[in-house]
């Protein structure tokens, strides 16, 4: 993120298919603050993506959060993290969490965040199959389904497990209703989870709307073995 004398926002990315205009959350994040505070100078954003696109990992929200934080600091706007979160939710439900970070209980559309203790140290293996998923389509499909009570994760049980700092209990409380939609359409998601578990993951689950899968390991070698097998 660079400050420029020339007014306006310039966005460069390392991926040719990413938009470099107001269709990009990073661009919109800069515009949001600069317009509100009447910033006369410009900003140059060089975005190098590592988080896969359309992977259910809040990659765009992470970019936007970084830009909000950077523009606030660079131009001395004086906003607190809470104030940035209040603005960020206007752009995307995941942005407040990306600004707060850590472990949290997320309620509402994602803007109501309650900090929780960090989970115990472990290894996390992330695997994205060669497919992309539209979050909008997944949520629309979920809305059309009739969910039972047992389809929903045990949030209270998860919080208790986190407070007890028991990684096995935490993993045992995994749950993601969106997996009913995405994994039902793409069996490879369940296949990846199975490989991780067979190689020693305490549990594995789809991230967000998918298709990315993550597994928790307490043994670094087991995580490495799963990585090599996948």
Model region roles, listed by residue range:
Residues 1, 26, 60, 94, ...:
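Residue-level signal for inorganic ion chemistry
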Residues 1-5, 67, 98, 120-123:
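Structural signature of FAD isoalloxazine-binding scaffolds in flavoprotein oxidoreductases
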Residues 6-14, 19, 67, 164-174:
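Short, basic/glycine-rich phosphate-binding loops at helix/coil junctions
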Residues 100, 105-203, 218-228:
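Conserved, helical-rich catalytic subdomain that frames metal- and/or nucleotide-binding sites
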Residues 1-55, 73, 77-85, 119, ...:
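ATP-binding N-lobe of GHMP and related small-molecule kinases
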Residues 46-75, 93, 202-217:
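Glycine/serine-rich anion-binding loops at beta->alpha junctions
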């Amino acid at each position: 993120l660079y400050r420029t004398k020339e007014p306006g926002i310039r966005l460069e990315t390392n991926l040719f298919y990413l938009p470099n205009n107001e269709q990009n959350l990073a661009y919109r994040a800069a515009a949001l603050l600069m317009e509100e505070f009447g910033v006369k100078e410009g900003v140059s954003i060089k975005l190098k993506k590592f988080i896969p696109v359309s992977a259910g990992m809040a990659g765009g929200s992470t970019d936007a959060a970084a830009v909000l934080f950077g523009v606030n600091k660079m131009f001395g706007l004086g906003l607190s993290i809470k104030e940035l979160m209040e603005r960020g939710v206007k752009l995307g439900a995941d942005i407040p969490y990306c600004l707060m970070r850590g472990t949290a209980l997320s309620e509402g559309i994602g803007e109501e965040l309650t900090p929780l203790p960090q989970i115990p140290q472990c290894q996390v293996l992330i695997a994205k199959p060669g497919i992309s998923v539209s979050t909008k389509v997944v949520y629309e499909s979920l809305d059309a389904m009739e969910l039972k009570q047992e389809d929903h994760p045990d949030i209270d049980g998860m919080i208790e497990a986190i407070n007890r700092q028991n990684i096995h209990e935490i993993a045992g409380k995994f749950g993601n209703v969106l997996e009913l939609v995405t994994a039902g359409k793409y069996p490879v998601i369940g296949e990846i989870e199975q490989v991780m578990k067979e190689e020693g993951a305490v549990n594995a689950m789809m991230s967000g709307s998918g298709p990315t899968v993550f597994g928790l390991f307490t043994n670094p070698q087991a995580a490495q073995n799963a990585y090599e097998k996948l």
